[in-house]
């Protein structure tokens, strides 16, 4: 257990969070998918919706035999829209999936596997140019579809790390990503706790899938698990408004349930939310 004064050391804080959560909750089985292309589809569909809705949309694509680049390519745009309708923003998402497949066809012969064989920085740069792909979506594709050693920053990880004072309220996406990657560089994922050692309060995890169980480099597996653990923590304990710290594996690391929620941090969060809302409005008009 780390002393509370050590919470100002971002790397040490991140490592302690990872160790505690992985011991308490075990493997998270992310990403729940059967192929790299399914991961890509899920990364698009999960934008601005719950994973439950994504699962409904993916089930529709699978039933239609369209959960592949060829399947998306051959579908009419209206048919694709209807299949992914449960995920919300279905017209924009259908257009973006079509554009991604067109990119895949023009650069990599329609093969997502060929794309993912390229260097991490090269793929990331290409993905970020595409309509509807921001850093979180690009990094989800890289980490979960291609096993590239890159951390996915989302609202959950940002919230947890802010409250534990590992990052500031106005930290940029890549700043947070690099802090986590640096902190977990030496962690090993080869030894995992058995189910008998897990906390009785362990949240429900996804069933193991072909993609979640694929062989990975140890560092990639750590980054994979860390993201899944942050998601669980954000959903079940570190809520936006009323965090449930009493049964949280990290509860004793904070002197107050929400940490030092200073006026400066609140102003920074408000400014970031306002900026994100403007950016979201701009993107969805494209």
Task: Identify what each model region corresponds to.
Residues 2-267, 283-284:
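Catalytic cores of DNA base-excision repair glycosylases
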Residues 267-286:
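Acidic, low-complexity intrinsically disordered tails
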């Amino acid at each position: 257990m780390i002393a509370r004064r050590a919470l100002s050391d971002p790397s040490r804080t991140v490592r302690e969070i990872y160790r505690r959560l992985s011991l308490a909750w075990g493997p998270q089985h992310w990403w729940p998918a059967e192929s790299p292309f399914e991961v890509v589809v899920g990364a698009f569909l999960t934008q601005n919706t719950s994973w439950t809705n994504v699962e409904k949309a993916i089930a529709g694509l699978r039933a239609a035999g369209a959960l592949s680049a060829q399947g998306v390519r051959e579908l009419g745009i209206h048919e694709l829209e209807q299949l992914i309708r449960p995920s919300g923003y279905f017209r924009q998402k259908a257009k973006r999936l079509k554009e991604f497949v067109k990119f895949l066809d023009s650069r990599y012969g329609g093969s997502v596997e060929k794309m993912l064989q390229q260097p991490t920085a090269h793929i990331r740069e290409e993905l970020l140019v595409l309509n509807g792909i921001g850093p979180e979506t690009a990094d989800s594709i890289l980490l979960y579809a291609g096993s590239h050693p890159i951390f996915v920053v989302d609202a959950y990880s940002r919230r947890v790390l802010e409250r534990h004072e590992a990052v500031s309220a106005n930290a940029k996406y890549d700043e947070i990503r690099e802090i986590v990657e640096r902190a977990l560089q030496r962690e090993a994922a080869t030894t995992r706790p058995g189910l008998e050692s897990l906390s009785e309060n362990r949240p429900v995890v996804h069933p193991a899938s072909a993609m979640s169980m694929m062989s990975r480099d140890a560092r990639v597996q750590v980054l994979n698990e860390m993201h899944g653990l942050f998601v669980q923590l954000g959903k079940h304990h570190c809520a936006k408004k009323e965090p449930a710290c009493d049964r949280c594996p990290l509860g004793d690391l904070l002197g107050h349930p929400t940490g030092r929620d200073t006026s400066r941090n609140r102003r920074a969060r408000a400014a970031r939310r306002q900026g994100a809302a403007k950016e979201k409005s701009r993107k969805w008009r494209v």
